[in-house]
């Protein structure tokens, strides 16, 4: 409740309803973080998954989001290194079996937005994901997960992510869309199948 003095004395202003996210989760710090896909090429579903103690947090992402994230992580880490030249280099070497997604694969939501940040005092990268909502939904209510991980963990995620993406259907060099074995309709070629 808010009360304020007006010309006629005390005026009551009802509280404003402030939209809140459905939930916010901090995985801080991640014991392990990875991305992977389940399914056959052309029908795969992509995930980011992290563990902390006994907790497993999984979200669904798009293939293009994983590819962009992998590129963005490398660019982001290059900036962090440039601004902090005394930091040891983050390794990107990974073991495939360790990077595979693990059950339970029970995603909390489909990701709409992805962001990166860096806490210099803790030398941790935060991977921020926000729930994808429909246009009718209040965007302020989107659920949020923040994955706090070491630079090495995030670099391994990025390099493994590139590998996961590359195992799918080849990408058309003209339009950037996935190609099917029987070809695809390329907008750059006026829709002709090639």
List each language-model region with its residue ranges.
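N-terminal amphipathic/basic-hydrophobic helices that include classical n-h-c signal peptides
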Residues: 1-19
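The feature marks the first
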Residues: 17-71, 75, 79
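Surface-exposed peri-terminal alpha-helical interaction modules
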Residues: 21, 33-34, 123, 169, ...
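Short, structured motif recognition centered on aromatic/hydrophobic residues
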Residues: 44-49, 69, 73, 125-129, ...
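N-terminal pre-domain and mature-chain start segments
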Residues: 56-60, 68, 72-96, 109, ...
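Mixed-charge, glycine-accented linear interaction segment located at domain edges/termini
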Residues: 59-61, 129-183
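Short cysteine/histidine-rich zinc-coordinating motifs and their immediately flanking basic loops
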Residues: 183-190
């Amino acid at each position: 409740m808010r009360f304020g003095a007006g010309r006629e004395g005390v005026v009551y202003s009802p509280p404003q309803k402030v939209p809140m996210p459905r939930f916010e989760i901090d995985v801080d710090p991640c014991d392990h973080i990875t991305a992977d896909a389940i399914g056959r090429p052309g029908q795969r579903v992509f995930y980011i998954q992290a563990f902390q103690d006994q907790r497993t947090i999984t979200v669904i992402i798009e293939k293009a989001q994983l590819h962009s994230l992998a590129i963005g992580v490398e660019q982001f880490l290059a900036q962090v290194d440039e601004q902090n030249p005394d930091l040891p280099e983050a390794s990107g070497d990974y073991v495939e079996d360790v990077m595979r997604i693990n059950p339970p694969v029970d995603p909390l939501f489909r990701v709409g937005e992805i962001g990166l940040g860096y806490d210099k005092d803790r030398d941790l990268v935060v991977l921020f994901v926000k729930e994808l909502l429909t246009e009718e939904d209040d965007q302020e209510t989107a659920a949020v997960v923040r994955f706090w991980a070491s630079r090495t963990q995030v670099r391994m995620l990025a390099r493994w992510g590139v590998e996961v993406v590359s195992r799918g259907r080849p990408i058309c060099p003209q339009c950037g869309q996935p190609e099917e074995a029987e070809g695809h309709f390329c907008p750059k070629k006026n829709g002709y199948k090639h």
